[in-house]
């Protein structure tokens, strides 16, 4: 494959797709493409027809790829929404735990942290009054 003249990966991909196997397009779009390939004395109309079939196949591939990308984007957006909600819930829980923890509990928690770890804003699991975990 001669791709030296193509500068971007997209140009290379388009070149590769354009030069993809005629038999693949034939199976995808109909058997008449194979006859054009086998006919070495193809007329200009046959070449145009072949180019049109290739363009249709490329459009089909592009549409399928766009559909797959849109689906993946929707899945990722939903995951982001779920993570944002979980983050908000954890922030609310953290705020509640900060307000319920006594200064002694905060000091005890911070003393258990290793020296290389920065101290968090609040304990992760402080004990509630009475000695039980919240």
UniProtKB/Swiss-Prot annotation:
Alphabetically ordered keywords of this record: Cytoplasm, Nucleus, Phosphoprotein
Localization per record: Cytoplasm; Nucleus
| Residues found modified as Phosphothreonine | 125
Compositionally biased residues, Low complexity? 125-134
Q: Does the keyword Nucleus apply?
A: yes
| Membrane-crossing segments per the record | none
One Pfam family name is: TSC22
Q: Which GO terms describe its biological process?
A: body fluid secretion; negative regulation of activation-induced cell death of T cells; regulation of transcription by RNA polymerase II; response to osmotic stress
> Quick one: where's region Leucine-zipper?
76-97
Location of region: AP1-binding? 1-60
UniProt-listed InterPro entries: TSC22/Bun (IPR000580), TSC22/BUN_CS (IPR047862)
One GO cellular-component annotation of the UniProt record comes to: cytoplasm
Post-translational modification Phosphoserine, affected residues: 102
Q: What is known of its domains?
A: The leucine-zipper is involved in homodimerization.
Q: What does this protein do?
A: Protects T-cells from IL2 deprivation-induced apoptosis through the inhibition of FOXO3A transcriptional activity that leads to the down-regulation of the pro-apoptotic factor BCL2L11. In macrophages, plays a role in the anti-inflammatory and immunosuppressive effects of glucocorticoids and IL10. In T-cells, inhibits anti-CD3-induced NFKB1 nuclear translocation and thereby NFKB1 DNA-binding activities. In vitro, suppresses AP-1 transcription factor complex DNA-binding activities.
**Family stated for the protein in its record:** Belongs to the TSC-22/Dip/Bun family.
Oligomeric and partner information: Can form homodimers, however it is likely to function as a monomer. Interacts with NFKB1. Interacts (via N-terminus) with JUN and FOS; these interactions inhibit the binding of active AP1 to its target DNA. Interacts with MYOD1. Interacts with HDAC1; this interaction affects HDAC1 activity on MYOG promoter and thus inhibits MYOD1 transcriptional activity.
Q: Under which name does UniProt file this protein?
A: TSC22 domain family protein 3
Q: What is the lineage of its organism?
A: Eukaryota, Metazoa, Chordata, Craniata, Vertebrata
| Encoding gene, per UniProt annotation | Tsc22d3
